[in-house]
Each structure stands twice: as structure tokens, then as C-alpha cells.
């Protein structure tokens, strides 16, 4: 290297031009995807284009557990509470996940309500036009039925109203950080302290 020139930092192979990724098919690919979506919508009519109904779940881990999103499927417990047989659920556009567990009553109740709302709005077409079975929708409902495009029953994230309060001297006197640190320490030493207390009790009995 000589003179006051820029030091090159391009780490290319000898024939790097042969491996350049091009995107000339992007507009055609966009059209193909659009046509495929339209064909699928026609094929699955009158079912919604967005696919089966999914539950509202909380994300995993400390980072995401405050956020709600759509899950894989409803639990057997939720279906039972909503009065929907597990074998019927997939046939009427409700996804099922036998592995998911309900860990809170609030989550269970919200998903049961979601199922009930869906069931109330549901229009069920008979398998054969001439043989109408119990549970199928009326001819009038069938005539007015339309295919739902895009998202249906979207998750509405409610903004919690915040109440402004004036800081009191009592509030200022409490150090929240110190309190959390103390409780963490207590939790960490709980086992050792319990063992020490048990050993001391044994010594006293001797």
C-alpha cells in the first residue's frame, strides 16, 4: 500500500460477479402470489381467507409475556367450556392445540368468550344442498353469507387508563429498588436459612 489512499475493505471472491443475487423476478413473483391468493379464496369459499380461528395468548419469556398475540389453537378445556365438541371444531374453522395448557382463569374466559362470539356469527353450509341437518344455517342466512376477507375477530389491545397522583412523603420514603433487592436476597437464602433453622432445632433437642 502506498500514498494517502483509502484502504480497501471489500472481501470479494475472485469471480464474485457470478454470485450476485438479482431480483428481476420480483414484480412477477408479486403477481404470482396475488393470483395464488385469489385462487385459494375461490377454492376454500365460503371459509374465511385468513384461515381458522386462533386463540389470544400471551408471549413466552419475560421480554414478551406482557404482549398478546394469536396462538396455534384452542385448548380442549376452552372448547369444552364453550360447548364445542373437539371433533367438530376443525370442521367449522376452529384450530385445536392439544398441547397448550390454560394457566390462568382470565385467559381461559377470554378465549371461551371468543369462541362463543365466533359461534354466534357462524354460518354453516350443509354438506349436501338438499339434506339439511340440525345445526346448519337457514336458507336466508346462506343467501346473505359472504366470504370474510383478511383478518376477522382481530386482537384489540386495550390501553389501560393511567391515574395521576401526587407524590406523598410516605411514597418517597419507600425505596422500591432496595425492597426488590432485599426480597431477591431473601429468596436466594431461603433454603440455607431453613436448613440452618432445622439444624439448630436438632441441636436444641439433643
Swiss-Prot record:
One of its GO terms (molecular function) is structural constituent of ribosome. GO terms for biological process: translation. Residues 196-206 have a biased composition (Basic and acidic residues). Residues 182-206 are annotated as: Disordered. The keyword Ribosomal protein applies. Residues 186-195 have a biased composition (Basic residues). It holds the Pfam family Ribosomal_L13e. Belongs to the eukaryotic ribosomal protein eL13 family. This is Large ribosomal subunit protein eL13y.
